[in-house]
A protein has these predicted regions:
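Pyridoxal 5′-phosphate
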Residues: 1-403
């Protein structure tokens, strides 16, 4: 690979070294859980400890955590079980803001359960969806609502607590399932504040690895009929043997964030350290995206480069470590290839089944996505801006084919 500047964090964050070591260690252990031996007992204790760690990370004092194939698979499962367990009739509500993980699942299970799917149209100008917009669509017959916490295309996060409150003010019994895949690495999660029924992430986007998804589910949804092994514990959401290594890597993530928060303030409190880490991460990412958009000194930011249009606008307080833009009249593929040659990793989002819901209303065929995490630096952002300036100079003298 060689030296590179990594601005593809929305496609997968950098992996903690401890996660690599933990995964290797547990892959070599043949023992299974639920056996009468010390190794099996140790595995069970590691899983339970990871769930306690996750409760601290997610800010959840109720409900339970479980792993699955991926964040998308878990969202499908949560939506499916909510749709089939909710009171018959009514409707299911989602938004055009969402990733297809929840949008596809909600539409499919609306059809399968004979319900109307009702869409909340997001706002093009700020790349977001609000509580007010949800309240205009949700009605007293709404059985299930899906919400995306932050978009991997616009980079904008929603006020989840406000949306949940608006939904329940109209439909108190409505179940709420949240896609937290993009949001998880960029801000503190506070499940207890949201009054929701499911929240799923993809750990590879939160400093862990591919190969599993991680979800929280409410006690309310657990008490409803859901998929489980016959005659098994009624509260269980786990199907088959659990991957202890997956759970253990969640603990690695929590330990890292504790360490980071401890650098901000010398505290013995885990919750204080995790909160400080979340605040520091948010502050660093705001500084990076502001620098990217506005530039510094004689280095032009995105807003001052010719022909550049930014999804969500130049000033958006809800931006979470991600800026998507295009140079009007220039292929985004061409620009990403140019940046690759400079050792700068970005990504093209096309108007396909993943991003068309955002790009098509704008009349865009594609865009360039630059996604940062707290470990990125201002010097890396400046390198990106200098490369973009160089691209525009080359294009102006005909050294870059803009078609």
């Amino acid at each position: 690979i060689g030296k590179r500047i990594f601005f593809e964090n929305a496609g997968g964050a950098l992996t903690l070294k401890s996660v690599v070591e933990t995964s290797s260690k547990f892959a070599a252990i043949p023992d299974n859980q639920g056996r009468a031996n010390t190794a099996s007992k140790a595995l069970m204790e590691i899983i339970q400890e990871a769930k306690k760690d996750a409760a601290n990370l997610f800010g959840a004092t109720t409900g339970q955590f479980f792993v699955g194939e991926s964040g998308t698979e878990l969202l499908f499962r949560l939506v499916r079980n909510a749709a089939t367990s909710a009171k018959a009739g009514g409707n299911i509500v989602g938004s055009s803001f969402e990733h297809p993980a929840t949008r596809s699942a909600a539409k499919y299970w609306a059809a399968q359960t004979g319900r109307q799917y009702m869409n909340v149209q997001h706002e093009n100008n700020n790349g977001n969806v609000t509580a007010q917009l949800y309240s205009e669509i949700v009605n007293r017959d709404t059985r299930l609502v899906t919400i995306l916490h932050a978009s991997p295309v616009t980079g904008i996060s929603v006020d989840l607590q406000a949306i949940s409150k608006a939904v329940h003010s109209i439909a108190p019994e409505a179940l709420i399932i949240v896609d937290g895949v993009q949001y998880a690495a960029h801000g503190g999660i506070k499940i207890d504040h949201y009054k929701i029924d499911g929240y799923a992430i993809s750990p590879y986007k939160m400093y862990s690895r591919h190969g599993y998804g991680f979800a929280w589910v409410s006690d309310r949804l657990t008490q409803m009929s859901h998929e489980q092994l016959l005659d098994g514990p009624i509260e269980s959401w786990e199907l088959g043997t659990r991957d202890t290594g997956s759970y253990a890597t969640i603990s690695d993530v929590v330990k890292y964030l504790e360490w980071l928060g401890g650098k901000i303030e010398n505290s013995e409190s885990r919750s204080v350290k995790l909160s400080n880490a979340a605040k520091a991460i948010a502050a660093q990412e705001i500084a990076l995206t502001d620098l990217m958009i506005h530039g510094e000194d004689n280095i032009k930011g995105l807003k001052d480069l010719k022909g550049i249009e930014i999804i969500g606008g130049q000033k958006n307080p809800d931006r979470k470590g991600l800026v998507s833009f295009r140079i009007n009249g220039t292929s985004s593929h061409l620009l990403v290839d140019f940046l690759n040659e400079k050792g700068i990793r970005t990504h093209v989002r096309k108007a396909d089944h993943y991003s068309g819901n955002i790009l098509n209303p704008l009349g865009w065929e594609d865009c360039v996505r630059v996604s940062v995490c707290h470990y990125n630096s201002s010097e890396e952002i400046k390198s990106l801006l200098l490369a973009l300036n160089e691209f525009q100079v080359d294009a102006s003298i005909g050294q870059v084919n803009s078609n």
